[in-house]
Amino acid sequence: MQTSIHLSLSLSTALLLTACGGGGGGDNNPPLDPGTPPANIPGNNAGNSVNGIYRGTAVVVPSGSTINGSHRTLNIGSDNLNTLNVNGKQFNLRPVNENGSITTTNIRSRDGKSYEIFVVSNFDYQNSRYGYIKSGNEDYIFSQGAPTARMPGSGIAQYVGQAAFVRNGDAGTGDSRFTADFAAKTLNGTITSKSSSVTFTPVNINATINGNSFATANGAAVSSGGHFYGDNARELGGLFSDTVQRLSGSFGAIRQ
């Protein structure tokens, strides 16, 4: 199955599919600790096998390219939340600044690698990392974390977070808000801009929850896919693409 995410990227700054069924009750208290991920997580559409307790997906394209069906969504895995392993390369995702929830940093060199743009979620996210990286001649968009081992089977939860996005070579950050109905298996949310360089009408995401993953329907104007992370679905994160507004990015949010 080919994931339908079309991302127009000229700047990039930081979805695993499991068979974990819904269980547990409707406890809506925000959990504090990451859950133990299942030992074996089946690969998603990418087809490549990975190792590590932190799982997710990434898209890698030559800088300035438009992501389309010819670009594969890659499974990614790591034993360190702050390490991104993709295409045989390793990137340090440890936030440069410890304050706030998402940071944009124009770092030029780190661990022997050069960067033009480095945008990654911060320590508010205990179980996941997401964002963009532009390094060398390649652009990266990614989301990874500790997949929720036991999903709530009922209850409604609110999630508040941030997003990083790009359009026509301009990158920016914004806010994300989601409502998860675990009994109805629905996730509905909105991404809004806080950036003066990238403005757009709110992006609406309407997805179906399947195990600890969620995805929009095929052919939706806004395509998105992602996962719940941590104990009791404490966090969520994923990728999105709005083909009408030619906008794409990654997002994360924390259960309130």
Name what the model sees in each region.
Residues 16-19:
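C-terminal motif of bacterial Sec signal peptides marking the signal peptidase cleavage site
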Residues 1-9:
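Bacterial N-terminal signal peptides that target proteins for export
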Residues 21-256:
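Mature soluble binding/inhibitory domains
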